[in-house]
Amino acid sequence: MPDRGQSRFRLDWVLVQELAVGPAPRAERHLDRLADEGVQAVLSLCSEAEAPPPPGLEARFECRRLVLPDHRVERMPELAELEQALAALAELRATGPVFVHCVAAMERSPLVCLAWLVRSHGLTPQRALDYLMQVHPGTNPLPGQLALLARL
């Protein structure tokens, strides 16, 4: 019988063996899933207060944390913040496949994945959004977040 807790932890490959997206890992079995999928690094876009990292995360993966605002705060991410996230992602990519997450993988982590597709793979913002919505159906960035993509 499958482990129900593990089956609820979703990991979607945006680009196979390059970039994956999903919600914050919260248990050791989530870390096992990341390792089983070949993930080498984790980029967190939420605060530790929003989603405390599970024990062992930093011992098992190369990790970076860059907190971006979401719908619960009074501002959109700034272009400089998105650029910082892309720089962190590029640095982590040198170690292998990267898992990008926020709390629920609806706004912030999809935004960074969209920006990666635009900047590193030459997709238009609309094409990147169409693609990401196919491979990661939970994608739901806010209009103000999407507007940043045109400024990359």
Region annotations inferred by a language model:
Residues Q6-R10, L15-P97, V118-R151:
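Cysteine-based protein phosphatase catalytic domain of the PTP/DSP
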Residues G96-L114:
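A phosphate-binding catalytic loop at a beta-strand-loop-alpha-helix junction
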Residues M1-G5:
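Non-catalytic regulatory/accessory regions that flank a structured catalytic core
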